[in-house]
Amino acid sequence: MSLAFGWAAVILLLQTADTASAVTTPHDKARIFADLSPQEIKAVHSFLMSRKELGLESSKNLTLAKNSVFLIEMLLPKKKNVLKFLDEGRKSPVREARAIIFFGAQDHPNVTEFAVGPLPRPCYVQALSPRPGHHLSWSSRPISTAEYDLLYHMLNRAITPLHQFFLDTTGFSFLGCDDRFLTFTDVAPRGVESGQRRSWLIVQRYVEGYFLHPTGLEILVDHSSTDVQDWRVEQLWYNGKFYNSPEELAQKYAVGEVEAVVLEEVVLEDPLPGATEQPPLFSSYKPRGEFHTPVTVAGPHVVQPSGPRYKLEGNVVLYGDWSFSYRLRSSSGLQIFNVLFGGERVAYEVSVQEAVALYGGHTPAGMQTKYIDVGWGLGSVTHELAPGIDCPETATFLDAFHYYDSDGPVLYPRALCLFEMPTGVPLRRHFDSNFKGGFNFYAGLKGYVLVLRTTSTVYNYDYIWDFIFYPNGVMETKMHATGYVHATFYTPEGLRHGTRLQTHLLGNIHTHLVHYRVDLDVAGTKNSFRTLKTKLENITNPWSPSHSLVQPTLEQTQYSHEHQAAFRFGQTLPKYLLFSSPQKNRWGHRRSYRLQIHSMAEQVLPPGWQEERAVTWARYPLAVTKYRESERYSSSLYNQNDPWDPPVVFEEFLRNNENIENEDLVAWVTVGFLHIPHSEDVPNTATPGNCVGFLIRPFNFFEEDPSLASRDTVIVWPQDNGLNHVQRWIPENRDCLVSPPFSYNGTYKPV
């Protein structure tokens, strides 16, 4: 075996170990989907560090000319082996880790991925090959903390000539030793072609909400080399004009040839108790303005007087007829597996694949920004959730452990939450009027859902990820976008690309797109894809032949190959998207699940246009493919920094145009929305209206609504004596936390 880093001897050829053990509970079997424990991460890290051939160092060493472990996460076994284990009682697949190593301490630096196993006691390491025809370029690697530190130190030195310029125009400095210092936000892609690592940096004042405080200066830095001495500032842009060096800008400023903008004074508030309170910055979360709701009255909140109705066994969630396993993948985010309803598998996997935000702007950084968030650690920036704000106080909070750009597992406390909540709308209800001022009966089923939630804070933006489970076999996937807008310095020309939000602030136009993998297994793995739509027919009225009648009829389309089931933006997407089993329900219909997409996304880049190759999935609101192990992920950690030659190109999944009739199918779903920033996005984008997602809904899968099994139903029957009979199947619980006793009248009459 020949490897790029030139040390084939490190591969230990070891036979697959038998790690099967006694399985007694759902938790035991579901461990196959569980993230690595801290002990497993440490075992993998220690094993790799012990391999002298690798020459590994700490990731924190301030050099890029080193070999270091960047990421360790669970490596998912092959689906066929997992199903044999889950469904047929075969032995458990070997548990392995995926490890990414940056090999910078050699003549030709490279990035290599490995499988390390078996866990919990690893003794072999094997290189993982990229998809055929692709490679992992050194320039495509994500930026590490060490590289950011080196970049900041280099920038500090390079822009020393601008010290007075910064003090005069911003009141802040890179060289300051007080709390009035400058920072930067870098954008990507990093250059204009494969192999480059040239980043535009937006210089900002480091205050609360610094994303909204650009100074007007943007700096282009070439940091391609592993030797920091080779790094250099290539260009600067200030207030609409380009400069070749910091020295040129400083010299022209000194002689009055720069159209300088002096920013308004920022009063920094002392956070210590007793300090004089200052007016909050416009970018601050601190309340201001009139608030007409009484502050002495707390808002409503969720209570659980009798405790939770769901169960958590390890990484398995049990709720009513639902059961599923969850995982928080460090590289890409939240995933659920083995989704069962009533003991029958509905989906093998539903997972976040990628999130992108594609911008326009007048400044070089604004026009360059095309964020591909897996390249920024989308799954690892899952910071603590606040009880009562991010999740109800009654939620079960779950920790996560990530090894991402570190030297060991890092604890992210309360990174996920799990909770049941009332929806505020009944799942079903009916008032059966007698049309005489009374009723025959009233019936309703209380609306409750179970929610699994996490967030990803990718620098300025916060994504809230939800998987929602309803008692009628419906599962919903949602993404809410919030956080600070990505903003640049205001110039009049910038109004073509955004909105002026403050004196010197432009909120840049952008489109959010999120990609999901939905591996539906509807009553088995042999499924077909079809759509239903209506078509109007004009017929002679059979009971009045002299008249015509127009009515809708059903029109079904069956899709036999992948190309037919790849729907491009701009093409009409049928409303009823059905994944069907050959099995039929009692009424003769194929047992199916419907995919219902809620999105306002549009295509944002021309197909084949430069960086678009990294996000070819964004051509399709829906594409259906045959399951392949080589097509597990639609993006990668590397697509951001080498979008011109990415190692994962989704379009290639469709090239072989495979048969999709009675096959194991995967739906790839793109959702998103255009965001034109507006003044109400200050200080933050709010969640209402900035939510997209999809549902999977049973469609003739059952013989009737499975929520009939719920005991949350209430039926009211009128009685002649005036006292209505309330029929319920769960006793009305009475204590200080419960609502007033249930009552229902049902009459209506003139007054």
Curated annotation (Swiss-Prot):
Recorded catalytic activity of this chain's protein: histamine + O2 + H2O = imidazole-4-acetaldehyde + H2O2 + NH4(+); N(tau)-methylhistamine + O2 + H2O = 1-methylimidazole-4-acetaldehyde + H2O2 + NH4(+); putrescine + O2 + H2O = 4-aminobutanal + H2O2 + NH4(+); cadaverine + O2 + H2O = 5-aminopentanal + H2O2 + NH4(+)
Active site: 373 (proton acceptor), 461 (schiff-base intermediate with substrate)
Record key words, sorted: Calcium, Cell membrane, Copper, Disulfide bond, Glycoprotein, Heparin-binding, Membrane, Metal-binding, Oxidoreductase, Secreted, Signal, TPQ
InterPro entries (alphabetical): Cu_Am_Ox_Cu-bd, Cu_Am_ox_TPQ-bd, Cu_amine_oxidase, Cu_amine_oxidase_C, Cu_amine_oxidase_C_sf, Cu_amine_oxidase_N-reg, Cu_amine_oxidase_N2, Cu_amine_oxidase_N3
Binding site for Ca(2+) 1: 519-521, 664-665
Signal sequence range: 1-22
Note accompanying the cofactor annotation: Binds 1 copper ion per subunit.
Regulation: Inhibited by amiloride and amiloride analogs.
GO molecular function terms listed in the Swiss-Prot or TrEMBL record: copper ion binding; diamine oxidase activity; heparin binding; histamine oxidase activity; primary methylamine oxidase activity; putrescine oxidase activity; quinone binding
Positions bearing 2',4',5'-topaquinone: 461
Residues that bind Ca(2+) 2: 562, 653, 656, 658
Assembly information from the UniProt record: Homodimer; disulfide-linked.
Protein known as: Diamine oxidase [copper-containing]
Organism: Mus musculus
Gene designation per UniProt: Aoc1
